[in-house]
Amino acid sequence: MLYICNKRRLFMSNYLFTSESVSEGHPDKVADQISDAILDAILEQDPQARVACETLVTTGMALIAGEITTSAWVDMPEVVRNTIKEIGYNSSEMGFDWQSCAVMTTIDKQSPDIAQGVNEGAGIDLDQGAGDQGLMFGYASNETDVLMPMPITLAHRLTRRQAQVRKSSILPWLRPDAKSQVTIEYENKIPKRIDAVVLSTQHDESISYNDLKEAVMEEIIKPTLPADMIDANTKFFINPTGRFVIGGPVGDCGLTGRKIIVDTYGGKALHGGGAFSGKDPSKVDRSSAYYGRYVAKNLVAAGIASELQIQVAYAIGIAQPVSINVNSFGTGRISDAAIKELILGNFDLRPKAIVQQLDLLRPIYRQTAAYGHFGRSDVEFPWERTDKIEELKSAAGL
C-alpha cells in the first residue's frame, strides 16, 4: 500500500505559478492609456490613420512622441489631460495632476518606406502587408470561465476592485497607483489553491498601516478572490513595505509598452516582444496578437484542446504569414499538425483580413489599456468572441 501511495505521488506534479497586474494609475499604464486615448481620438475622425504614439509621464509632465499620418485634427493636450483626470490624478498633492501637468508633443509622419509596404496596391506585395516583421502569440486555456490562466485573471480582478473602491469612495484614502500579484498552486496542471497574494496600493497620509491592511483585506481581497481557493496556508502581503504614499508618475517614470506581460497572459504563454498601446491595427504587433487570441480561444472553446498556444510570424510588407506554429501542450483531441490545418482552413491571417474580421478600425482601444487586453468580463472585445465553435467542431470531426 505504501508503495502504491508513493508511486501515485511520483506521477503527481505540483507547482506554483505567479502573475501580476497593475492598476490604471500605475505610471506605465497611465502612459498606455494616454497613447490609446490619442489613437481613439484620431480613429474617430480618420479610421485609415497610421498611428504609432508613445507617451512618457513623470513628475508634472507628459511627453507625447511618435509617427502619425492622418487627416484628423486632435487637441492632444486636452486628450492627455482628460485621460489623467479620468484615472484619478486630480490633486497637486499627488505631484502629478491633470490641471497643472505640462504636456509636450513631438510628432512626425510615418516613414514612406514603411507606408508602401502597408498600403494596399503599393510595394512588392500589392495586398496590404504587415506593418513590420515580428512574431506574435495567441493563447487560451480552459482553467477559467474566460479561457485565461487563473493567476493573471485573479490579479486583474484585484486591481480593478482597487479602482472601484477608490472611485466610489468606499476607501476614500486610496490613490490611483496599485499593483497585485497572485500565486496559484497547480496539481497536474489544474489550479488547486491560492498560495500567495500581494497587493500594494497607494494611499494618502491619513490612514494607519493597520487600518489599511484590514480595509484592503475586507473591501478588496475577500470580495474578489474565490473563497474556496483560500485556505489556512494562503499568505497575504498587503503593502509589505509599510508605506506607499509616493506613487504614480512621481514615484516612477512611466512609458508606453512596458507592461506587455500584464497586458497578455501573465507569463503563462510566450510573448513576441511587441507592445500594443498607441498602435493602429495595421501594426501586426497588435492586430495579429488579438487575432491569435481569437483563434486560440475558439479552438479551446470548441473542445479541440484544453490549452493552446499559436505563434504567427510576418515579414514587413508581406500579407501572408511566414510561419505558423501550434502547441496544444499534449491536450489536443487531434494532433497539433491537424490543428494547424484547421487554422489555415478556417481563419484568414492576412493583416487586412484580420482588421476586417475583427472590425478594428474603430475607437475601442483606450479601454484595452488597463486590466488586460484578453479575458475581460467587464467589456466586450471582438477578439473575445467564440463564434467559430460549431464550424471548428465540424471541420475537426468532433
UniProtKB/Swiss-Prot annotation:
CDD domains, sorted: S-AdoMet_synt
Specify the superkingdom. Bacteria
Q: How is the cofactor bound?
A: Binds 2 divalent ions per subunit. Binds 1 potassium ion per subunit.
| Essential cofactor(s) | Mg(2+); K(+)
Q: Would you identify the family this protein belongs to, as annotated?
A: Belongs to the AdoMet synthase family.
InterPro entries for this protein = ADOMET_SYNTHASE_CS (IPR022631), S-AdoMet_synt_C (IPR022630), S-AdoMet_synt_central (IPR022629), S-AdoMet_synt_N (IPR022628), S-AdoMet_synthetase (IPR002133), S-AdoMet_synthetase_sfam (IPR022636)
**Metabolic or biological pathway, per its Swiss-Prot or TrEMBL entry:** Amino-acid biosynthesis; S-adenosyl-L-methionine biosynthesis; S-adenosyl-L-methionine from L-methionine: step 1/1
In the record, what terms sit under GO molecular function? Answer: ATP binding; magnesium ion binding; methionine adenosyltransferase activity
Protein name according to UniProt:
S-adenosylmethionine synthase
Q: Where in the cell is it found?
A: Cytoplasm
Query: For binding L-methionine, which residues are annotated in this chain's numbering?
Result: 67, 110, 252, 283
> What class does this enzyme belong to in the EC scheme?
transferase
Entry GO CC: cytoplasm
User: Which amino acids does the record list as binding K(+)?
Assistant: 54
